[in-house]
Amino acid sequence: MRVPAILLVVLALSACGGSKAASASDVVRAWSAALDRNDNEQAARLFADGAQIVQNGEATLATHADAVRWNAALPCGGRIIHLELQGKNQVLAIFELQERPQHSCDGPGSQAAAVFQVKNGRIVLWHQTPVPAQYAPGGQVI
């Protein structure tokens, strides 16, 4: 009787340490998918409290509610056309902008880029950046 009980405890403890935070690329994909569904609540869950936003100035998303509002204000969704890992926790994402539910995208078909820094499975920096020329052939770059 003692052996099965001890075995259960060992199995339970070994399962506790096995999880790891999602990769930066996985977090970016999840954020993009949530935004494309207009699921601002889910998109916001991927941001750490205190996340920095660099887009026409700088802002800090101090709370989850701030992150929900910021995501809800984005006019476009985007199809990821390229992800480039820039170190363990940073990803450059290139998007083709598209409409998203209940929004009016101001640049459908254009490309946009953002650098994401991710720590412990949460976005700590979202920085809009110019689209590298090699990813914008014939397209309008914003």
Report each predicted region and the residues it spans.
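Sec-dependent signal peptide recognition
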Residues: 1-8
